[in-house]
């Protein structure tokens, strides 16, 4: 999964961007009440386990 695809899913589920970092962005999920980091590495694929963990923290999966 690419970062852009992941961000679309996060926005659809109601998550919001909290802060930009140098290589990662900090997001907040109102469903879970958690803050979580999303890597911002251009058009590269995000590892499957990393994407699964981010989606779980966001309350999407």
Question: Model-found features: residue ranges?
Answer:
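Basic nucleic-acid-binding interfaces
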Residues: 1-20, 28-61
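Positions that flank functional sites
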Residues: 25
